[in-house]
């Protein structure tokens, strides 16, 4: 229910045989989270990366000590009921805590988006002469193209207020998948004030996902999804082998393996946060 668990750790696996033991540790992490999720499917996890001053010894994977008097990263891993974590994150103003560098949210859930929380944006982000939506504000009836443009650009609005996902993750266009392949997500931003009026209901957390497609590659339907993938900051913070040195102040030995172990459990049932379909009836030249 409202009980949460908080782990403070450097999140460094204590292993010597990097090649075999790290994968075993990753798999054990996945199994532990799968076991917990089987008991409570609404259990979510937040991982916070902080950097603080440090004065002590850093031990590499061979347990060799190195004097370290420079900033080091540490992690706060919070698990519990999704709604309880959302309350904690807001009430404790986690986003503004000193030393916070990165964060990630994990949930086993996937959400359904429709005309109540998504729309085709007709006012901004487009080079079309006009976009006319159908009555549901999401599907497009017709697009009047700019004949001088080499591609069509437009945007889909999504209200993320009900989805358990980090703001920085939402803004990374590489986390999105769109079909057909000729369509591309070229940018993501908070929705402009005028775009908010394109929603059927006033959104609490509106974002605009900008899409581009070359002229001549149009399709009658597109499918947009926000994938559950390892956040970019995790890969940037990872060191595969720390033997013989102290990693940089924002990097940790094998942190990617630990996060991959957690993420694998949370993507077991759904590999996306949502999947949204938009029909486009007509393209007018």
Language model features by range: what are they?
Residues 1-285:
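Acidic, low-complexity intrinsically disordered regions
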């Amino acid at each position: 229910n409202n009980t949460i668990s908080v782990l403070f750790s450097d999140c460094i696996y204590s292993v010597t045989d990097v090649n075999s033991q790290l994968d075993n540790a990753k798999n054990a992490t996945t199994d532990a989270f799968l076991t917990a999720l089987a008991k409570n499917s609404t259990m979510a996890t937040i991982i916070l990366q902080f950097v603080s001053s440090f004065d002590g010894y850093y031990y590499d994977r061979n347990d060799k000590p190195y004097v370290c008097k420079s900033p080091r990263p540490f992690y706060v891993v919070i698990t519990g009921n999704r709604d309880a974590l959302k309350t904690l994150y807001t009430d404790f103003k986690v986003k503004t805590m000193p030393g916070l560098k990165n964060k990630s949210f994990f949930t086993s859930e996937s959400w359904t988006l429709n005309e109540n929380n998504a729309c085709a944006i007709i006012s901004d982000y487009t080079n079309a002469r006009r976009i006319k939506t159908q009555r549901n504000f999401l599907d497009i009836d017709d697009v009047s193209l700019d004949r001088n443009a080499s591609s069509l650009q437009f945007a889909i609005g999504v209200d993320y207020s009900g989805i358990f996902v980090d703001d920085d993750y939402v803004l990374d266009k590489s986390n999105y998948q769109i079909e057909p392949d000729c369509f591309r997500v070229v940018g993501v931003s908070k929705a402009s004030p005028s775009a908010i009026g394109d929603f059927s209901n006033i959104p609490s957390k509106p974002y605009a996902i900008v899409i581009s497609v070359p002229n001549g590659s149009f399709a009658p339907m597109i499918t947009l999804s926000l994938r559950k993938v390892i956040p970019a900051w995790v890969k940037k913070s990872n060191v595969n082998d720390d033997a013989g040195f102290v990693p940089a102040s924002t990097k940790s030995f094998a942190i990617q393996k630990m996060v991959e172990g957690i993420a694998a459990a949370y993507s077991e049932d759904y590999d996306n946060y949502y999947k949204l379909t938009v029909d486009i009836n007509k393209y007018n030249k």
